[in-house]
Design a protein with these regions (language model features):
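Short, solvent-exposed coil/turn segments at beta-strand boundaries
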Residues: 26-27, 53-63, 88-92, 109-115, ...
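Short, surface-exposed beta-strand-loop junctions and turns on beta-sheet-rich folds
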Residues: 70-73, 101-104, 123-126, 133-134
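Short, solvent-exposed loop/turn elements at domain surfaces
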Residues: 38-43
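Sec-dependent N-terminal signal peptides
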Residues: 3-13
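N-terminal helix-cap/turn-to-beta initiation motif at the start of protein domains
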Residues: 17-32
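Short beta-strand segments that buttress and anchor functional surface loops
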Residues: 94-99, 118-119
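Edge beta-strand at a domain terminus
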Residues: 80, 117-142
């Protein structure tokens, strides 16, 4: 009986951990692609001026657009946006995107204040919070 109680406690503990891996309110803001996994390969972004995904969320609806910080340290935003809706099915969260060109969906595998992991078409996209504020404030401090 004692072993059964211990096993049940472990299951409950690990279930609580996994359910807290998605903090949906943390989606708001800027996200920088860290790497992409596909078929056991890891791909990392290359280039001097990375693109960032900017999410604006008023649950359950939101807007996604791409932004870029150029060498002049100004943030440039794409005029193209994708509207989205957060949907929860069977304890899993999905982002349902809709642009003027197409519709697609990504599953949220992990989301907290520092890390976002999305899955789409057998690819896993790993994002991190960029240090944009330090970059912008560095110019003002000079």
């Amino acid at each position: 009986m004692k072993i059964l109680l211990i096993c049940f406690s472990f299951l409950l503990f690990f279930n609580c951990i996994s359910s807290h891996s998605i903090e949906i309110e943390k989606l708001n803001g800027y996200w920088e692609i860290d790497h992409i996994n596909q078929r056991k390969e890891r791909f990392e972004p290359k280039g001097n001026s990375p693109l960032y995904d900017h999410y604006f969320l008023e649950y359950p609806n939101g807007i996604l657009n791409k932004v870029e910080i150029r060498l002049d340290r100004i943030i440039y935003s794409s005029k193209d946006i994708a509207n989205f809706k957060i949907e929860r099915l069977d304890k899993k969260y999905y982002i349902r995107f809709k642009s003027r060109w197409s519709e697609w969906s990504k599953q949220i595998k992990h989301l907290d204040s520092h890390k976002l992991v999305l899955e789409h078409n057998k690819r896993t996209f790993h994002y991190k919070r960029p240090d944009l504020y330090e970059f912008i404030n560095d110019e003002r401090g000079k």
